[in-house]
UniProtKB/Swiss-Prot annotation:
Note: This bacteria makes up to 60 cubo-octahedral magnetosomes of about 45 nm in diameter which contain membrane-bound crystals of magnetite (Fe(3)O(4)).
Subunit structure: Probably interacts with MamX and MamZ proteins.
Keywords: Biomineralization, Lipid-binding, Magnetosome, Membrane, Transmembrane, Transmembrane helix
Name used for this protein in its record: Liposome tubulation protein MamY
Keyword Transmembrane belongs to the record: yes
Membrane topology: Multi-pass membrane protein
Keyword check for Transmembrane helix: yes
Superkingdom of this protein's organism: Bacteria
Disruption phenotype: Deletion of 4 consecutive genes (mamY, mamX, mamZ, ftsZm) leads to cells with an intermediate magnetic response where magnetosomes have short chains of nearly regularly shaped, cubo-octahedral crystals flanked by small particles with poorly defined morphologies.
Gene behind the chain: mamY
Chain ranges on the Lumenal side, renumbered to this chain: 40-51
Function statement: May be involved in constriction of the cell inner membrane to form mature magnetosomes. Binds cardiolipin and liposomes. May function with MamX, MamZ amd Mms6 in biomineralization.
């Protein structure tokens, strides 16, 4: 009786499996063709979440059914092989009780394994059906809500998430814009501060000429000058020299910018480099422009001379640096060697800049090689 039942099941599964295989495969292929023709694979991610889930479920159900039928077929084949073994053993030794007992145990173990596999498949199928029912319940309209749109709740959740992400992106863009504006304001303030020094250029030149002629403000150790008067004169000279050095820093910055733009042609890179030097200048390094210009004159004198030949303003800037540097050096050298003003200003970066420029340019800014 058991053998007849197994034979009937085997015939039923073998005949129906082919139909299920063909139907499931056709279902999957038609689903893929439908998506390709009417929706497009590029529009999948623009679908709502429940639509994507239904699409995946539609394609995966026939595949799962094919796998289930395949496993059932394997189980039936295994049972048939066991049946064949039992028949063979029965024919070989029909009177052996030990062989019959062993076959019964083997069949019992195999039946338990088959039952476990069938139970697992039934549980998996039940879970798949439950997921499908939950998805349908989610897509179905609520009778108590009165909402005409069955996907209103899901659409509202998706809309709130999108608005949250948009708000975060707008906050980041606003913070970045504020940072850029703050950097631009800081840079504009530095440029305005440097430009304001140009207003004093003519007055400083006249003051230096007057001081060089009179020499009365130089704190020479004269008899009859008390320490307070000597300190006042040194302070006055230091203030004049400080204004002159600020003006020279502005001129050196302009000359350095003209030279770098002509040599490299990268205005953005030049602006970044000048901004770095400006930050160092306002941080306390008052000689940073002189030191950078000395390096360019020493290492790229040919390029600077070519720039001076083709640009009148470059020659004027070089001439201004040479004339003011010589006046400052003359004032400082007139001080007593032990005076603080001379100790601070003598043999500094400005001295090195004047020496480097004087080796390649005349007092009017004309290159020596072109004179």
């Amino acid at each position: 009786m058991l053998m007849n039942f197994v034979n009937n099941v085997s015939k039923t599964i073998n005949g129906g499996a082919r139909i299920v295989y063909v139907g499931s495969f056709s279902w999957a292929v038609l689903s893929l063709l439908f998506v390709t023709a009417f929706s497009g694979w590029n529009n999948i991610f623009s679908m709502l979440p429940h639509e994507i889930f239904i699409l995946v479920l539609t394609i995966s159900l026939p595949i799962a059914l094919i796998v289930l039928i395949f496993m059932l077929s394997q189980i039936v084949r295994t049972v048939e092989s066991v049946k064949s073994e039992i028949s063979t053993l029965s024919q070989r030794d029909p009177v052996s009780e030990e062989a019959v007992t062993m076959l019964a145990d083997l069949f019992r173990e195999h039946r338990d394994a088959v039952a476990a596999q069938v139970a697992a498949q039934v549980e998996a199928t039940a879970q798949l059906v439950q997921i499908n029912q939950d998805n349908r319940a989610l897509a179905a309209p609520s009778p108590d809500s009165g909402d005409e749109n069955p996907l209103a709740l899901l659409a509202q959740m998706f809309r709130e998430y999108r608005e949250t992400v948009t708000a975060q992106l707008e906050a980041q863009i606003s913070a970045t814009t504020q940072l850029v504006e703050a950097s631009r304001d800081s840079r504009d303030g530095i440029v305005d501060e440097l430009r304001s020094q140009r207003v004093l250029s003519q007055e400083i030149t006249q003051e230096l000429s007057h001081i060089a002629q009179s020499r009365n403000v130089v704190p020479v150790a004269e008899p009859g000058l008390d320490p307070s008067q000597r300190i006042d004169r040194m302070r006055a000279l230091a203030e004049v020299l400080g204004l002159a050095l600020n003006d020279l820093s502005m001129t050196a910055t302009q000359l350095l910018s003209e030279h770098l733009n002509a040599a490299h042609g990268d205005r953005e890179g030049t602006q970044k480099f000048i901004s770095t030097l400006t930050n160092a200048y306002f941080a306390g390094d008052k000689n940073v422009f002189f030191r950078s210009l000395v390096s360019e004159v020493v290492n790229h004198s040919d390029q600077l001379q070519q720039c001076a030949i083709g640009a009148e303003n470059v020659r004027q800037q070089i001439s201004k640096i040479l004339r003011e540097a010589r006046e400052i050096r003359s004032l400082v050298s007139a001080c007593d060697p032990n005076d603080l003003v001379r100790i601070v200003f003598e043999d500094g970066e400005l001295w090195a800049l004047e020496k480097a420029l004087a080796e390649h340019f005349l007092i009017d800014g004309t290159p020596i090689s072109d004179a």
